[in-house]
Amino acid sequence: MVHWGEVKRMKIEVRGNQVILDGYVNVVDRESRMLPSPRGYFKERIVPKTFEKALKKAKNVDLLFNHDKNRNLGSIENGNLELYEDNIGLRAIATVTDEQVIKKARNKELRGWSFGFVSEKDSWEEGESGVQKRSIEELELLEVSILDMTPAYVATSIETRGENTAMIEMRSEEAAVKTVVEDDTEERSTLIKQIKKVLEGN
């Protein structure tokens, strides 16, 4: 049995001049909380294997900071982002060398994951109390983001792509962040060794 609290965890390891982030960007087959839209409030779930199909089609997926295209932290192509769907959802493992992100990781200011996508196939049905339910069956995964702000689960933006206009949707959720600063121990043991050397020299 998978506990949701465990799934929501973002594990962060600070190792010298890099930080390794590991966690679930989204859990599949789980109904979201109520989301706003022009057609009223709705609940949403992503069908299992949707991310798997998206990753097979994707030439690349970028890793951004707060969905900011000017703050590109890497990508699958770059080799510092690994994405895959397992029986829980979309898992991300990222190695980041950006100084600002490392500093925020040390200060425990990182809040969770988010992802940007274009829906390619979805279905709607009437749920309980007239609440619409949306199932996303196919999507184009554009990017995953590391957040340092409390996520607003749902957001959208309009982008012109070639001759077409696409609605890019963003989904995020705050994670229970667990930070391990490994290099503190290394620095301490190095310092102890240096002190011992000095004492032995005397």
How would you label these PLM feature ranges?
Residues 1-170, 178, 182:
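Signature of dsDNA virion morphogenesis modules
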